[in-house]
């Protein structure tokens, strides 16, 4: 198979690197320790670097074209058992191919940018489509032409280029300089995906999606707000809106049915199950300031979560069902024990208050809370 033939194959295939531990050096093409692919010291494409040997990493066609463009046209390509073997002189590359339906993806893009949506700022489109654009499900779009042309993957960070919003900017008359590339970290992508999963019952509704200078903002039914900028993501949980979700009136609340409350908290718990499964609590400590957790994660490092603040590197805070249940078991002796809510305080935080102020479950809505 020649280069010209390969170009006919790749656009209809989703290509993935089969192993994450790519440490070998093949001729002039180097797969480095951090999974950065270079050719003649020029960085061509970056892949996520995981410890799981069986992890498959997605690569888009634009990146492949850059790599293949450096190879001789007489390079040989062989496909055996879904593995793509490339040889060019002393260079050898082995990849695994996965098929996907290109036409269905094009149809989705057409539906997103259909004139019937009447693009405006903010504008609406289907929630599922929105999450496809902003989560890891975006991978196949990398094989398409404009406006979804190229993406840079580095470790757990997904860099989405401005060209992704070309159609939006054109209709909104936004200059390229006004919007910088967005960074959606693994945590933020998880928050988006888990939010969608938690609210799956409402998937027929649309969400508000707004480009505000350097920020990409999502509004989930005026209950949960997710803002992703070029530096960090913030998730806001307005207590008053959550109370509406709980069908609660007033700030002093009595939950006659604790099981029902746990069910609601579990629905809006955004931490992935993998996080809970790999986190082993060493011990718990209760004091006048509230509940303090000391946890040990799978890597052996100790992680302190004080007063139930869920601190994540990119600034996202979330409910966690397991912690919430511990509070209920510790402080609620019966189903009629009151739970107070404190709306946005001077720091912009909101909280559930248990046991006459003995414990606070804090939900942060400000960047300052991270410092």
Region locations from a protein language model:
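Structural preference for solvent-exposed beta-strand-turn elements
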Residues: 1-371
């Amino acid at each position: 198979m020649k280069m010209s033939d390969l170009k006919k194959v790749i656009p209809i295939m989703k290509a993935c690197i089969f192993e994450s531990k790519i440490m070998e050096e093949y001729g002039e093409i180097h797969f480095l320790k951090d999974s950065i692919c270079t050719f003649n010291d020029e960085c061509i494409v970056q892949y996520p670097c995981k410890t799981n040997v069986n992890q498959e990493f997605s690569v888009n066609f634009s990146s492949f074209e850059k790599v293949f463009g450096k190879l001789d046209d007489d390079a040989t390509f062989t496909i055996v058992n879904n593995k793509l073997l490339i040889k060019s002189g002393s260079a050898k590359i082995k990849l695994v191919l996965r098929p996907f339906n290109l036409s269905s993806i094009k149809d989705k893009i057409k539906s997103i940018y259909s004139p019937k949506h009447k693009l405006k700022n903010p504008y609406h489109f289907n929630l599922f489509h929105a999450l496809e654009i902003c989560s890891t499900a975006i991978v196949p779009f990398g094989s398409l032409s404009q406006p979804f042309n190229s993406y840079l993957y580095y470790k757990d960070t997904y860099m989405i280029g401005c060209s992704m919003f070309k159609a939006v900017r054109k209709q909104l008359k936004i200059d390229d300089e006004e919007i910088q590339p967005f960074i959606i970290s693994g945590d933020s992508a998880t928050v988006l995906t888990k939010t969608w999963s938690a609210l799956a019952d409402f998937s027929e509704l649309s969400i508000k999606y707004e480009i505000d200078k350097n920020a990409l903002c999502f509004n989930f039914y005026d209950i949960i707000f997710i803002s992703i900028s070029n530096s960090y993501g913030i998730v806001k949980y307005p207590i008053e809106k959550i109370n509406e979700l709980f069908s609660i009136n007033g700030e002093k609340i009595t939950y006659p049915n604790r099981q029902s409350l746990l069910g609601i908290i579990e629905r809006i718990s955004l931490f992935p199950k993998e996080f809970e499964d790999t986190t082993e609590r060493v011990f718990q400590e209760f004091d006048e300031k509230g509940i303090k957790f000391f946890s040990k994660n799978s890597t052996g490092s100790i992680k302190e979560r004080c007063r139930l603040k869920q601190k994540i590197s990119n600034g996202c805070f979330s409910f966690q069902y397991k912690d919430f249940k511990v509070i209920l078991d510790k402080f609620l002796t019966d189903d009629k024990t009151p739970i107070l809510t404190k709306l946005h305080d001077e720091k912009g935080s909101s909280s559930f208050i248990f046991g006459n102020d003995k414990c606070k479950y804090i939900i942060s809505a400000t960047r300052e809370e991270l410092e």
